Design a protein with these regions (language model features):
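Amphipathic alpha-helical effector-binding/dimerization core
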Residues: 29-128
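Short, basic/aromatic recognition patches
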Residues: 53-61, 125-171, 217
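Residue-level recognition of specific faces of alpha-helices
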Residues: 16-22, 36, 70, 81, ...
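N-terminal helix-turn-helix
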Residues: 1-47, 51-52, 212, 216-217
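Sensor-regulatory modules in signal-transduction proteins
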Residues: 174-177
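Juxtadomain coupling helices with adjacent low-complexity linkers
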Residues: 182-219
Length: 219
C-alpha cells in the first residue's frame, strides 16, 4: 500500500528474494528477513566513498600497530561502523562493518558527540539510557558532559575499559571540507597490551597522522 506496487508484483519480488535466501515465510504469507540480508547493507557501507578510500590507510595503520582500526559515523544515538581493518590479535568484542554501538559509551562516539550542536546533544542525552557496562563506565549525564568537553578540547577520546573490561580504545575526529566532523577513527587494544598512557604516547601520534591523510580524502 505504501509503495503503490501491485500485490502480484510484490509477491514475485518476495519469491525471488526467498530463492536468494534473503527472506523466508514459514506459512507462505508472512515474510521475515534472514541474516543474509545484512550482506547487502555491509556491501553498501563498504562501497561508500569514505569507506572505499579509507581502507588502504586503515590497513597500513593496523599493520603498523598490529591492532584493529575502525571508522564510524554517527547514526541516531549510535555509532555505525563503515570501515575496519582487523589485526591478528583476538578481540573479545566482535565488530564488523555495519556494527552499531551506543555513541555515548565509545571513544568514536564521544569524539562525534563532542562536536554536535548543543541543542542536538541535549536531545540525545535526554533520550539515552546510561548503562554501567563495567565499573569504569561513566555513570551520569553530568560526568559524560564533562568528558565530552574534555574530548573536544584535547582533540581525542580515550575509552579505558568503559564498554568492556580489558578493552581500551583511542579515537580522533575526521573533518570534511567544511571543517565539520564527518566521522571518527579509532584503534582498539587489549588492556594488557598497552597502558592508557602508552596509548597516548605511542598510538595517538600515528592515529592523528592517519586522520590527517583521511581528512584530505574528504576535501
Amino acid at each position: 500500500q505504501k509503495t503503490g506496487i501491485p500485490r502480484a508484483a510484490v509477491r514475485r519480488c518476495l519469491y525471488t528474494l526467498s530463492k536468494l535466501g534473503f527472506v523466508y515465510a514459514e506459512d507462505g504469507k508472512n515474510f521475515q528477513l534472514r541474516p543474509r540480508i545484512l550482506a547487502l547493507g555491509h556491501a553498501w557501507l563498504a562501497s561508500t566513498p569514505l569507506a572505499r578510500s579509507a581502507q588502504p590507510v586503515l590497513r597500513h595503520l593496523s599493520e603498523m600497530l598490529n591492532e584493529s582500526c575502525s571508522i564510524a559515523t554517527l547514526d541516531g544515538d549510535d555509532i555505525l561502523y563503515i570501515a575496519r581493518a582487523s589485526s591478528s590479535r583476538i578481540m573479545t568484542i566482535d565488530l564488523d562493518i555495519g556494527s552499531r554501538l551506543p555513541a555515548w559509551a565509545t571513544s568514536m562516539g564521544r569524539v562525534l558527540l563532542s562536536h554536535q550542536p548543543e541543542e542536538k546533544l541535549n536531545d540525545m542525552l535526554a533520550r539515552v539510557t546510561m548503562i554501567r557496562y563495567t565499573p569504569q563506565t561513566v555513570d551520569s549525564v553530568a560526568k559524560l558532559r564533562a568528558e565530552l568537553k574534555r574530548v573536544h578540547q584535547q582533540g581525542y577520546a580515550l575509552n579505558d575499559q568503559e564498554l568492556e573490561m580489558g578493552l581500551r580504545s583511542l579515537a580522533v575526529p575526521l573533518f570534511n571540507a567544511q571543517g565539520q566532523v564527518q566521522a571518527a577513527l579509532n584503534v582498539g587494544v587489549h588492556a594488557g597490551q598497552m597502558t592508557a598512557r602508552e596509548m597516548i604516547e605511542r598510538v595517538l601520534p600515528e592515529l592523528q597522522k592517519a586522520a590527517r591523510e583521511l581528512t584530505l580524502l574528504l576535501r
